[in-house]
Amino acid sequence: MRRAAGMEDFSAEEEESWYDQQDLEQDLHLAAELGKTLLERNKELEGSLQQMYSTNEEQVQEIEYLTKQLDTLRHVNEQHAKVYEQLDLTARDLELTNHRLVLESKAAQQKIHGLTETIERLQAQVEELQAQVEQLRGLEQLRVLREKRERRRTIHTFPCLKELCTSPRCKDAFRLHSSSLELGPRPLEQENERLQTLVGALRSQVSQERQRKERAEREYTAVLQEYSELERQLCEMEACRLRVQELEAELLELQQMKQAKTYLLGPDDHLAEALLAPLTQAPEADDPQPGRGDDLGAQDGVSSPAASPGHVVRKSCSDTALNAIVAKDPASRHAGNLTLHANSVRKRGMSILREVDEQYHALLEKYEELLSKCRQHGAGVRHAGVQTSRPISRDSSWRDLRGGEEGQGEVKAGEKSLSQHVEAVDKRLEQSQPEYKALFKEIFSRIQKTKADINATKVKTHSSK
C-alpha cells in the first residue's frame, strides 16, 4: 500500500508541466509590457529626433549663411589689405615727393634770398654808376664850356688862329675830338642797360620761384589732406577687421555647437546604450507585482542586464542621456561637410528607428508563436493524458509508471522543439540584427535559463524524494 501511494505521488508530480504556467504568463506579460514600452519610447524618440533635425537644419542654414558672410568679409578684407598696400606705397611716394619738394622749396628760398641780395647790390651799383655818369656828364659839360671860352678868347686875341680854326683841316680835327668826347660815356650806358636787363631777368626768375613755391605749398596741403583721408580709411578698415574677428569667433562657437549636435547622432555604441537605457529598466519601473519580480530576480541571480558591470544602465530621460554622451568625448569629433553630414545623420537615425520598429514587430510575432506553441503543447499533453488513462485504468501502478514516463518524454520533446524553434527564429533575426538588439536575445536567454533552472530544481526534488 505504501508503495502504491508513493507511485501515485510520483506520477502526480511527473504529470506536472515542465514549466510553471504562472511564470510563463508573467514572462510573456513582461515581454508584452517591454514591447509596449519600446513602442512608446520609439514614438517619443521619433518626435525628439524630428525636433532635433529641424534644429539641426536651422543651425546648418545659419552656419552656411555665416560662412558665406565670412567669405564675403574675407574677400572684402583682402581687397582692403590690397588697398592698404597701395595706400602705403602711395603714402611713401607722397612722403618722398613732399620731402623733395620741401628741400626744393628751401633751396628756392635760399636762391631767392641770394638773388634778392644780388639785385639789391646791383641796384646800388647801378645807382652809384648813374651818379658817376651824371657827375662825369656835368664835368664834361664844364670842360667843354671852358674850352669854348678859351677858344673864343684865343680867337679874339689871336686873329691868325681864326683862319686856322676856319680851315677844313682844323674843322676835321675838331669834329674828331668832339666825336671822341661823345663816345666816351657810351660804355657806361651799355653797362647800365645790361644791368637793367639782368635785374629784369632776376625779377622774372624770382616771380617764377614764387609761383613754384605756391604750387609746392598747394601740393603739400593736398598731400596732407590725402594722408588724413588714408588714416581715416585705415581706422575704418581696422573696425572692419575687428568685426571679421568677432564673426569668426561666432562661427567657431556655432561650429562647436554643431559638432556637439552631430555627435548626438554618431554611429558609436554609446548612442544605442543611451537610447535603450530607459527601455531596459522600464519593466522594473512598471512592474505591477514587485514581490514576484524580486523573487524572480533572486532565482536568476544575475538575470537583469543592469546587474552586470559591462551593462550599467541608469534610468534617465533622452536629453540627459544624450548630454552624457556629448560630455564623454566632445574632442574626438571633427566637423566635415555640414550638409552631407546632416543628411547621413538623418538617414542613420531613421534607419535606427525602423530597425527598432521591425524588432518590436518580430518580438510580437515571436511572442505569439511561443504562446500558440505553449497552448498547443499544453492541450496535447492533457489530451494524451486523458487518452492513456482510459484503457489502463484497471492497473493503477502501471498507469502511474507509464504516465510518468510519457509526461517526462513529452516535456523533453516539447522543450527540445521549443528551443529549436527559438534558435531558428534567433538565427533568422540575427541576419540583420544590430549590436543593440542583443538585449532582446539576452532577455529570452534569461527566460529559458529560468525555465531550465526551475526544471532542474524539480528534477532534483523528485530525485531526492
Curated annotation (Swiss-Prot):
Please indicate if the UniProt record lists Thylakoid as a keyword.
Answer: no
Q: Which GO terms describe its biological process?
A: Golgi to secretory granule transport; vesicle transport along microtubule
Annotated Basic and acidic residues bias: 392-405
> Where on the chain is Phosphoserine found, per UniProt?
S308, S318, S344
Coiled-coil spans in chain:
38-143, 188-265, 350-377
Keywords in UniProt for this one? Coiled coil, Phosphoprotein
Spell out the molecular function terms from Gene Ontology: identical protein binding
InterPro entries the record matches: CDR2 (IPR026079)
According to the UniProt record, one GO cellular component term is: cytoplasm
What are the start and end residues of every segment in region (Disordered)? Answer: 282-314, 382-417
| Family in the record | Belongs to the CDR2 family.
Write down what this protein is called: Cerebellar degeneration-related protein 2-like
Q: Which organism's genome codes for this protein? A: Homo sapiens (Human)
